[in-house]
UniProtKB/Swiss-Prot annotation:
Name the UniProt record assigns to this protein: Protein phosphatase 1 regulatory subunit 37
Extent of Pro residues compositional bias: 1-12, 605-626
Taxonomic lineage from the root: Eukaryota, Metazoa, Chordata, Craniata, Vertebrata
Species, as recorded: Mus musculus (Mouse)
Acidic residues compositional bias, start-end: 16-29, 514-531
Subunit: Interacts with PPP1CA.
Length: 712
């Protein structure tokens, strides 16, 4: 290492050694330098270049510390543990315990989910008391944390907001009526608003947000915030705080409700900021500006923003803002352009009759307003007539408030006539007591008109409820169901629709055109088709001979409808049995039974159709059951005996030596309720086949053994 000149030891040869060393270093520097730069002007040379080496990748990280889990204390916690931890914290911090909090903790039951409310309203919370609350917040979460009027100072508010942000303690937070949280309190609140993803509702009524605190809140609302509802009533927002807030909210897409009442907002700068906010923000749904000083000039700015609101704002409250008929002209021009505004409250403004006339045309052109507030707006009978014209023209108006106005007999008569035409208005608020009239009989007329108006609203309410019930029925009709369309007259006459046959050969299952919407039906259909193929392969050419020897199997053309003469595969056959299966999200399918066979005519009156019939044996009677019905319950293993089983008649032994008692082993007769399911033979086949397999096998075995003796 080079020794500085002031530290070099004195000696006669010191200067010579220093010069020699300097020349050596200069030569080495020039050799190593790729550019060959000249030495500095002062003659001093830099030291030799230093090299830096790094350890291997495995040795770079010597250790790691995981972040603390805020919920490590909240697993399987009990009420006693929470109370004990809170009391220990109070003793450690030497602060008083809150009896109201202890009572609420003892009432909590389900600690795994968010608890409905933690109510600390009216309790005085200093810094130490707030610090003790951390033992509760680290173990429990709440939906609502109510800190209204708790006398929070900057330190206590900062501590509480940090806890709520870290532990995500609340979705709804009320900090209203805390006038001393100061700048640090608002800074912590802004950090909480920005970082807490679960916080949706913040109530800061009567909590001043001054010039030096507003930038923090504005920054939190502009960057990202999960807040959907923000109450800032009486927060001293007029001026710069409102400008910062409105500018930030132009880019906020999450806030839905903004309440700015009682902030002394003026009709110039403040209203201009609100108008610009409405131009750029289309996600805000409720804007409450009651009890401010918007005036007609400010309403002009707001209406300019409303014209740009193709969608977004749903409720606008302008209650008590010194608006007159001049401002109603601006609003009347803006209303035809709004497509989302549903509630407009203009109460307690001296609008007068002229203002309502200026507003009427805009309201008629507007098709979105459902609720209109005109309470205490200096209206008389003349203004009520203009309102009645709007009622008669409106197909959507639900509620109208006309209280605290001098509406007498003439105005009530106009409103009553308008209600006879209107079928949407459900509530019309009027003063209960009739107004004084020079003619005493008019007072009774007013009472009668008031009753008639109320009856008209009740009538509309009944109509709306009927429409809702009809819509509910239509909705329920779209639920999963199986319905039979185009019922056949054959069912009414007692004839049984059987499965179709093709080319004169009976078929044991549904036709190939049939289909269903469920997987189980598809599996049953595949099984039945496999059985059919096995039957046809085993029978071979015996079908024609068996049919020729059994004329009873050939149905008479007189018993069939005219549509039965068409081929089974014809989709236009009028006797097709269509069964529709509908299910929301799974589509709509229709399967068709293309052939309908009926039993031979009987001398006795027709009986309800059954799949299996076993009457007492008598020689002259027709067959006991249609052959297709008997085959529906037959097992595939007995397909060899199938041609001989078909001509079974009462009073005669069955072919192949089967006894007449064979029919007794068939599945029991279905209940009468199954008559309506005439087209679902495949389902009946699947149900009965599994029940009668064992009995059929026993009878067939017995018949095969006794056949020689019976035929003799």
């Amino acid at each position: 290492m080079e020794i500085p000149p002031q530290e070099a030891p004195p000696g006669p040869g010191a200067d010579a050694d220093a010069d020699a060393e300097a020349e050596t270093e200069e030569a080495s520097a020039e050799a190593e330098s790729p550019t060959g730069t000249s030495p500095p002007a002062d003659g001093r040379l830099k030291a030799a270049a230093k090299r830096v080496t790094f350890p291997s990748d495995e040795d770079i990280v010597s250790g790691a510390v995981e972040p603390k889990d805020p919920w490590r204390h909240a697993q399987n916690v009990t009420v006693d543990e929470v109370i004990s931890a809170y009391r220990q914290a109070c003793q450690k911090l030497n602060c008083r315990q809150i009896p109201k909090l202890l009572r609420q903790l003892q009432e909590f039951t389900d600690l795994e989910q968010r608890i409905n409310c933690l109510d600390l309203k009216g309790e005085k919370l200093d810094y130490k008391t707030c610090e003790a609350l951390e033992e509760v917040f680290k173990r429990l979460q709440f939906k609502v944390v109510d800190l209204e009027q708790t006398n929070l100072d900057e330190d206590g508010a900062s501590a509480l907001f940090d806890m709520i942000e870290y532990y995500e303690s609340a979705t709804h937070l009320n900090i209203s009526f805390n006038k001393h949280i100061g700048t640090r309190g608002w800074q912590a609140a802004a950090h909480m608003m920005r970082k807490t993803s679960c916080l949706q509702y913040l109530d800061a009524r009567n909590t001043p947000l001054l010039d030096h605190s507003a930038p923090f809140v504005a920054r939190a609302l502009r960057i990202r915030s999960s807040l959907a509802v923000l109450h800032l009533e009486n927060a001293s927002l007029s001026g710069r705080p409102l400008m910062l807030l409105a500018t930030a909210l132009k880019m906020n897409m999450n806030l839905r409700e903004l309440y700015l009442a009682d902030n002394k907002l003026n009709g110039l700068q403040d209203s201009a900021q609100l108008g610009n906010l409405l131009k750029f923000n289309c996600s805000l749904q409720i804007l409450d500006l009651r009890n401010n000083h918007v005036l007609d000039s400010g309403l002009a700015y707001i209406c300019e923003g409303l014209k740009e609101q193709r969608k977004g704002l749903v409720t606008l409250v302008l209650w008590n803002n010194q608006l007159t008929h001049t401002g109603m002209a601006f609003l009347g021009m803006a209303l035809p352009h709004t497509q989302s505004l549903e509630t407009l409250n203009l109460g307690h403004n001296p609008i007068g009759n002229e203002g309502v006339r200026n507003l009427k045309n805009g309201l008629i052109s507007n098709r979105s307003v459902l609720r209109l507030g005109l309470a205490s707006t200096k209206l008389t009978c003349e203004g009520a007539v203009a309102v009645a014209e709007f009622i008669a023209e409106s197909p959507r108006l639900l509620r109208l408030d006309l209280r605290e106005n001098e509406i007498k007999t003439g105005g009530l008569m106009a409103l009553s006539l308008a209600l006879k035409v209107n079928h949407s208005l459900l509530r019309l608020d009027l003063d209960r007591e009739p107004k004084k009239e020079p003619v005493k009989s008019f007072i009774e007329t007013q009472k009668a008109l008031l009753a008639e108006i109320q009856n008209g609203c009740k009538r509309n309410f009944v109509l709306v409820r009927e429409r809702e019930e009809k819509q509910q029925l239509q909705l329920s009709a779209s639920m999963p169901e199986i319905t039979i369309t185009a019922p056949q007259p054959l069912e009414e006459s007692g004839e049984l629709p059987a499965v179709g046959s093709q080319n004169g050969a009976p078929r044991p299952g549904p036709g190939p055109d049939s289909d269903s919407d469920s997987d189980s039906d598809r599996e049953e259909q595949e099984e039945e088709e496999e059985d059919q193929r096995n039957q046809q392969r085993d029978e071979g050419g015996n079908d024609q001979s068996s049919l020729a020897s059994c004329p009873a199997l050939i149905p008479s053309t007189d018993s069939l409808g005219p549509g039965d003469k068409s081929p089974p595969s014809s989709p236009s056959s009028p006797t097709e049995q269509r069964i529709s299966v509908s299910s929301p999200g799974r589509g709509h399918k229709v399967f068709v039974v293309t052939r309908v066979e009926s039993p031979p005519e009987r001398p006795e009156p027709p009986v309800p159709p059954t799949f299996v019939s076993s009457p007492p044996p008598s020689p002259p009677s027709p067959p006991a059951s249609p052959p297709s019905q008997t085959m529906d319950t037959q097992d595939p293993e007995s397909s060899e005996a199938q041609p001989q089983l078909e001509p079974s008649q009462a009073g005669q032994p069955l072919p192949n030596g089967l006894k007449p008692e064979f029919a007794l082993a068939l599945p029991p007769e279905p209940p009468p309720g199954l008559e309506a399911k005439g087209g679902s033979c495949s389902l009946e086949h699947a149900l009965h086949r599994s029940q009668g397999v064992s009995k059929l096998e026993e009878l067939l075995l017995e018949a095969s053994q006794e056949a020689p003796r019976d035929t003799l």
